[in-house]
Amino acid sequence: PGFAIEEELLHIQPFLQEKTCIGSVVSCTGFFFTAYRILGKTASLFGFQRAPFIARVQTYGQKALLLGYKKELQIATVNISKSDILLRTLQEMLDTPVRMLHHFLEASLTNSNPLLHPARLYSLFHTWSRGKAYHEIPGFYNSWDEESSELLIACDNEFQQILKALPVRIEPIPTLLEYYDSYDARSLTRKIRSIIAFKHIPAPMEKTEKGFLPDFKSRYFTEDFPFGLLIIKSIADVLNICTPNIDKILLWGQDVLNKEYIHE
């Protein structure tokens, strides 16, 4: 998870040898940026663009459910001279084809979880007020609605403008409509609702005496806001690109989390 990357890099740093390869299954939570800052720009790094599968713990330390396997994976490398050997090793380990990206930003920037989760959370809970409880836990994906799709598409349009201003190829990071074989909010809603691997994933909520409340300790909040959407927003600011929909979600998120990410 994004919040643990810095701590783990600092922990292993004294034991690293020259040209030791350090990698992350999840790159979109700031792995490359954090590794550069801590290990220096000569560090040998690799990172996946998307996780190989969805994992859910069933029995802690013993059993997990692995769902939604990808047909193909993509990684970016930095300062790794024999990247072909790394590629073959990862393919053998995961039994999945792995392709090489051209730039580490192509792995660092994704319109997957950093956009998908916050947009859905906003649609689910933006009318929530402190003290309000819900009678049931909605499905995060199987009750996905057009409001969520419309906001997600709007955020992705802003994200695509950022990509166009960076030295990356557009092809490895398709629009969400392209990725989900959809053409508008309605078809995207149908598609997301139909994904079998997503079927039984609940919205992040916790049970209380009054009912169910949003679980602000969930990684959907603790990771995808500060280590996902905020990274995208920070790059947009450097490029002077306006992101009104991303801003709206971040402002709401920082309010319910009692944080300060951006200014109005």
What are these regions (language model features)?
Residues G2-G61:
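Rossmann-like NAD(P)(H) cofactor-binding subdomain of soluble oxidoreductases
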Residues E7, T89, E150-Q161, A165, ...:
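A non-catalytic, amphipathic alpha-helix used as a structural packing/dimerization or gating element
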Residues T29, F33, D84, I153, ...:
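A structural signal for well-ordered alpha-helical segments within the folded catalytic domains
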Residues A185-E264:
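C-terminal helical cap and adjacent loop that interface with cofactors, partners, or active-site loops
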